[in-house]
């Protein structure tokens, strides 16, 4: 292969990765100040995409998360996610950059200026969308829209009690299944029951304790077909 052509393809691929991740950032930036009232957004949208989750972070700070994939569908792995937060020019929080997984699994990420909601949510979702595309060959934007539509009108928000660094913390759990009622689910039936759970708490640095996805096996007594879990490990200056 021509080295120049190969380099051009790699550059184009990286631009595409950054642009698709930026789509989530743009969607999440739809704040009331942009002409929408808070009542135009569902409680789940406000909790996931619009809450000032970084309000309890003093920059500079690094948030570290563990990531685990498991299940009978294919091989699993353990990896890490790191979010670096820096002060804005006016000293407020935060400008952010991230490292989502490592090696060949690494997700190219855009830096986020003036972040208020925790970008790790958007990064996790973009990773998830890529995986749905890889496993089903379905269009990434289709899955992206299904998630956003379900967060708007089909998600459940409930109070929750979690543990962080060995201590109980109060928070909220947002759960939804974006593909369950999809008329096109027959195209990816094996993964159509996928469930998403967001564990959120103001007592945790960055407001996100964890994110979990789960696809149950066809048999109730069989282990899950696929699980992915991101959990906060801690924060350091």
Give the positions of each predicted feature.
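Acidic, serine/threonine-rich low-complexity disordered tracts
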Residues: 38-112, 136-237
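N-terminal secretory signal peptides that target proteins for export/translocation
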Residues: 1-16
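Bacterial N-terminal signal peptides
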Residues: 21-32
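Surface-exposed, glycine/proline- and aromatic-rich loop segments on solvent-exposed faces
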Residues: 106-131
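Intrinsic-disorder/low-complexity regions
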Residues: 1, 18-19, 39, 78, ...
């Amino acid at each position: 292969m021509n080295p120049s052509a190969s380099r051009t393809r790699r550059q184009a691929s990286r631009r595409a990765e950054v642009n698709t991740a930026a789509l989530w950032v743009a969607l999440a930036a739809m704040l009331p100040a942009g002409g929408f009232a808070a009542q135009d957004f569902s409680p789940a949208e406000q909790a996931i995409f619009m809450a000032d989750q970084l309000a309890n972070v003093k920059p500079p700070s690094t948030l570290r998360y563990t990531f685990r994939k498991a299940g009978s569908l294919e091989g699993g792995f353990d990896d890490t996610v790191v979010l670096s937060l820096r002060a804005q020019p006016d000293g407020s929080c935060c400008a952010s950059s991230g490292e989502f997984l490592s090696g060949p699994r690494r997700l190219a990420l855009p830096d986020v200026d003036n972040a208020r909601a925790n970008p790790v949510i958007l990064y996790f979702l973009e990773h998830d969308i890529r995986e749905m595309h890889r496993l089903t060959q379905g269009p990434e934007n289709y899955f992206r829209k299904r998630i956003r539509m379900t967060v708007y009108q089909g998600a459940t928000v409930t109070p929750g009690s979690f543990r962080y660094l060995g201590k109980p913390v109060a928070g909220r759990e947002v759960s939804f299944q974006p593909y369950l009622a999809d008329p096109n689910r027959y195209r990816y039936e094996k993964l159509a029951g996928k469930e998403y759970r967001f564990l959120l708490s103001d007592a945790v640095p960055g407001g996100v304790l964890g994110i979990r996805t789960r696809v149950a096996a066809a048999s109730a007594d069989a282990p899950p077909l696929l699980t992915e879990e991101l959990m906060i490990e801690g924060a350091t200056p």
